[in-house]
Amino acid sequence: MGASIYLGKVLSAGTKGCNIILPTAPSFVGLLDTYPNAAAAYSLRKLRTAYTGNCIRVRRSSDNAEQDFGFVNNVLDTASLLTFVGAGSGFVTTWYDQSGTARNATISTAVEQPRIVNAGVLDTLNSKPSIINPNAGVIRR
């Protein structure tokens, strides 16, 4: 006769139930939680557990409007980004420093801004959001 699971206990014929310990999802630990003394830190993933700021500020090509984007589940909120950009392209104007030193990287010249959305499609590398710099502009802090 096989064992059955009932309310967290394994029950089988002729034996008492025993507790089952199910693994829980690991807590998020950011890279900067382990290495807290960074002078500056930029990523499309959240790097510090306590960081509550935005990830990037993006300009959309259709009307040059700009908007900040944060994180969902510790990665860039790509759904909101794609909704904002629509069928056009999106360019990063500010990449926010997650180190806590406020050394945000900005680039105000539109033709030098790196792209993150191309014609409504998220730029990716190995299936991860990626910032592409087709014009070789430099983001400055």
Where are these regions (language model features)?
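GGW-centered surface loops in extracellular recognition modules
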Residues: 3-114, 136-141
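Short carbohydrate-recognition loop motifs
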Residues: 124-137
